[in-house]
């Protein structure tokens, strides 16, 4: 399968490496037209305000709002998928969640921890960098993981969102789950 990574900012190469380790083809998506070539899309981390500005500039907002592609958002990608963002309007409105930006603190408060992610594994390494958390989930959203009582991973149908950066580790099981359990079944 061909899985795209929105290549406007963030750890694009690292996500593509995880896609390839999962046995699939990774494509850096830089143009809206490329969405026709893929079966699923990863929205990488970075700075969420910048990501939204770039998505507006290159026409991705409307295209992705209207898209039926399965999507996986990490960190800022999670924020972009959310229906609501504390103090702001949602953006793509794909996940029925409310997200709090930077809720784990500033850059100096970044941390790594082992995660037990329902349906994936009990020993996933999570890298949290200025990470958001999911403050509230709506109907149809499955909570997959919490850290210190804060929700950090959810799934709603063909949409997966995590607060952390799985692509910054050698463990590709979260990406593999997205492709082989979400994209394949969509």
From Swiss-Prot:
What residues bind L-glutamine, as annotated?
46-48, 101, 129-130
Q: Which domain of life is it from?
A: Bacteria
Which is one GO molecular function term here? pyridoxal 5'-phosphate synthase (glutamine hydrolysing) activity
Kindly identify the residues recorded as the active site.
75, 165, 167
Q: What reaction does this catalyse? A: aldehydo-D-ribose 5-phosphate + D-glyceraldehyde 3-phosphate + L-glutamine = pyridoxal 5'-phosphate + L-glutamate + phosphate + 3 H2O + H(+); L-glutamine + H2O = L-glutamate + NH4(+)
Q: Which CDD domains match?
A: GATase1_PB
Please give the pathway this protein is involved in.
Cofactor biosynthesis; pyridoxal 5'-phosphate biosynthesis
User: InterPro entries of this UniProt entry?
Assistant: Class_I_gatase-like, PdxT/SNO, PdxT/SNO_CS
Alphabetical GO CC annotations of the entry are: cytosol; glutaminase complex
Q: Name one GO biological process term.
A: pyridoxine metabolic process
The record ties this protein, via PROSITE patterns, to:
PDXT_SNO_1, PDXT_SNO_2
The EC code for this enzyme is 4.3.3.6, 3.5.1.2
> What Pfam families does this protein map onto?
SNO
**SUPFAM superfamilies this protein is in?**
Class I glutamine amidotransferase-like
Q: What keywords are annotated for this sequence in UniProt?
A: Glutamine amidotransferase, Hydrolase, Lyase, Pyridoxal phosphate
How does it associate, per the subunit comment? In the presence of PdxS, forms a dodecamer of heterodimers. Only shows activity in the heterodimer.
What this protein is reported to do is described as: Catalyzes the hydrolysis of glutamine to glutamate and ammonia as part of the biosynthesis of pyridoxal 5'-phosphate. The resulting ammonia molecule is channeled to the active site of PdxS.
Family the entry assigns: Belongs to the glutaminase PdxT/SNO family.
Q: What is this protein called?
A: Pyridoxal 5'-phosphate synthase subunit PdxT
* Source organism (scientific name): Staphylococcus aureus (strain Mu3 / ATCC 700698)
Q: Which gene encodes it?
A: pdxT
């Amino acid at each position: 399968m061909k899985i795209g990574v929105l290549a406007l900012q963030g750890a694009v190469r690292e996500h593509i490496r995880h896609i390839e380790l999962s046995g699939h083809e990774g494509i850096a998506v830089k143009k809206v037209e490329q969405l026709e070539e893929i079966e699923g899309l990863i929205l990488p981390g970075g700075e969420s305000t910048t990501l939204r500005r770039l998505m507006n500039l290159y026409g991705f907002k409307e295209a992705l709002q209207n898209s039926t592609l399965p999507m996986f958002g990490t960190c800022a990608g999670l924020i972009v998928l959310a229906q609501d963002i504390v103090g702001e309007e949602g953006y793509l409105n794909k996940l029925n969640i409310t997200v709090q930006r930077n809720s784990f603190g500033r850059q100096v408060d970044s941390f790594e921890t082992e995660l037990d992610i329902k349906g994936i594994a009990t020993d996933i390494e999570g890298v949290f960098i200025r990470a958001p958390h999911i403050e509230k989930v709506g109907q149809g959203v499955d909570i997959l993981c919490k850290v210190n009582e804060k929700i950090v991973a959810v799934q709603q149908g063909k949409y997966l969102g995590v607060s952390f950066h799985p692509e910054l580790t050698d463990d590709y099981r979260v990406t593999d789950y997205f492709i082989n359990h979400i994209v394949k079944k969509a």
